Structure formats: structure tokens, C-alpha cells
Amino acid sequence: MLGRLRTVVKASSSNSIRNYLGYTSGVQKKTVTVIPGDGIGPEITSSVMGVFQAAKVPIEWEIFDISGGQPISQELIASITRNKVALKGPLYTEILSGSQSRNMELRKALDLYAHVVPCKQIPGITARHDDVLVDFVVIRENTQGEYSGLEQVLTPGVVQSLKIITKEASERIARYAFEYAKANGRKKVTAVHKANIQKQTDGLFLATCTQIAKEYPEIKFENTIIDNCCMQLVKSPEQYDVMVTPNLYGNIVSNIGAALVGGPGLAGGANVGEGSIIFEMGAHHVAADIAGKDKANPTGLLLASVMMLKHLGLNEHATKVENAVKAVIKEGTLTSDIGGKSSTKQFTGAVIDYIEKNQN
């Protein structure tokens, strides 16, 4: 069922770009840049494409076959800028190499300042807290903090890393968090920080969030120290609604959130900028150990693709895909990471079958 996509040949200066045409109808097609990425990326991206074909989503895919070991090309940046929307698999970052993370490179090049990760339990999956509803959203400042990439060796054996926090970036992410809460019927925003120790950097972030909170009196505002936040997430995650964080803390908290709802394969996410948005899994795990073995869980990227469809105004298609994914999980078709025995293709096939049986 995954082989039903029709290839469209277009002139290109790079053989790393492929174009696929999804379902064709009277509806104007939308073009989306796709980066399958490394590890399990190509498998879960293929899953999304197969599901979209079955759901008759009017999308044309512009695919860039790049790896985390390759530089980000200007052609890729131009594609995302032109299309304004991209779907991305995980990109591998070598731990001890001197090269910059390609994920960071994309965020900086496109000014993707907000990383949004909804963490919500899915019926049919055994989670860490079955007695309470886990349903919170992590909104992470995506361009500064410890991820500024400003590191240097001062002398052999001594290195320095600069943490950059600005009022402008803090205002932007805080306002985004409150606007997100307002638009999505959320009641509370919690700022996560370490201002008790990092009094200047995190102090500025917290002070700015506190200032912006005054513009939204209808939304409750709290703040919490990052170490206590991690403990409380494990202990009582139901107390959180929307969390706004500096860069590093958001990475940590969103991974905890993914674990709380069942694992890294279950959370979708988006990197949001003023001009472009990249949708991807909420937890960026390449999972090289299972790559190519038909064991990957495509749920996280499927849920990210649902977010993408809603952003594009394709709400009926979004509902169709989301309902199918949740129905298949509830019926017990699960991949091995969440206690099942289904392969990637079997899970994807079950989602496609559900869509085709319930097609209007």
C-alpha cells in the first residue's frame, strides 16, 4: 500500500531532491518540503506518505535526501522558505564531532523560534500515569540559551560555553506561549527556569515572562525551577498545562513528556517561525539500532503531520488521519516500543485500511 505514490519528474540542479505527487483532485494542491532524515526517518516518512495517499490529501511532496552529516544546502532553505511548511524526520548529530547540529542550523537559518510539543495520553497505550490525564504542551525557545553555538577552548583542558538570553527573544516566546494557551483553551502557563542560580540569564527570562503574563489576566501564570519541574512531571504531571522554557530545559522537559505518554515514538511537534514551520517528532531520536528493521513507530510523525494539516487548513483530512491513528491504537495494533508485535508496515497498513473503510 505504500507503493502507490506516483513520481513526478521536475528539473532540478540536485539529484538529492525528489518530487512525489499525492492524491490529485479538484482541490488545489499544497507543496510541502520533506526531509526523511537519518535512522528510522525514511521509514516513518514513508508511512506518512502512504497514509496521506489513502486519505486523499491534496499534497505534493518535495523531498530532500540529506543526512545530519551533510551541510544544509541553500536549495533546501529556499524550498522551505518558498513552501512555508516542511515535514522532517530525525537528523543525526555526532556527539563528539566539531560540526554543528543540522537541526540547530535549520532553526537559525529560518528563525524557527518556538518548538511546540503537545504531550497527551492516547487511549490504548499503557502510560506511566493511568490514574490521571497527562495533557500538557511544552513551548521551548528555540534559538538562544546554551544552543547558541558559542563555545571555545580557552586553554588545553579548559573550555567555555556562552548562554545567550535576550529580552526580545524571551518576550517573543512568552507571548507565543500565552497566545497559544488563549487560542487552544488552555488555562495556565508555567515558566520553567533556574533563576535561583543563573540570576542574570534565567532571571531575565523569568522577569520577561512575568511581565508578559500581566497582558493575559485570564490565564493563570506560575513559575517553577527546572529540577523541581522534572520531579513534579514524574510525580504529578496533571498539574501542568502550557510550559514555556528556555532552549535546553525545553529539550529535557519535552523528552520527559514523551516518556510520560508512552515513549519517543508517540509525540508530535513543530518548529515555528514567522515565515516557515517544520513539523517533526516531538522527541528527536534517530533510533539507529532499529533503522531498516521495520520496527519504528510512526505515530509521532503521523501526529505531527496532523498538526501540519490543521495548519494548512485541511481540517477534514487532519481529522481523518488522527481518528484512524487513534482507532488503530485503541484496537490494539501496536509497535514493539509500546508493547505490541506489529511492524511499521503493519501499523501503517492498519491505519490505511481504517481510512479506506471509513472513507466518505
Curated annotation (Swiss-Prot):
Residues 1-113 form a transit peptide. It comes from the Eukaryota. Mg(2+) binds at D227. GO terms for molecular function: isocitrate dehydrogenase (NAD+) activity; magnesium ion binding; NAD binding. It is an enzyme of class 1 (oxidoreductase). Transmembrane segments: none annotated. Its EC number is 1.1.1.41. Pfam families: Iso_dh (PF00180). Its cofactor is Mg(2+); Mn(2+). One of its GO terms (cellular component) is mitochondrion. It catalyses: D-threo-isocitrate + NAD(+) = 2-oxoglutarate + CO2 + NADH. Substrate binds at S101, N103, R107, R140. Binds 1 Mg(2+) or Mn(2+) ion per subunit. The keyword Oxidoreductase applies. Belongs to the isocitrate and isopropylmalate dehydrogenases family. Heterooligomer of catalytic and regulatory subunits. Performs an essential role in the oxidative function of the citric acid cycle. This is Isocitrate dehydrogenase [NAD] regulatory subunit B, mitochondrial. It comes from Dictyostelium discoideum.
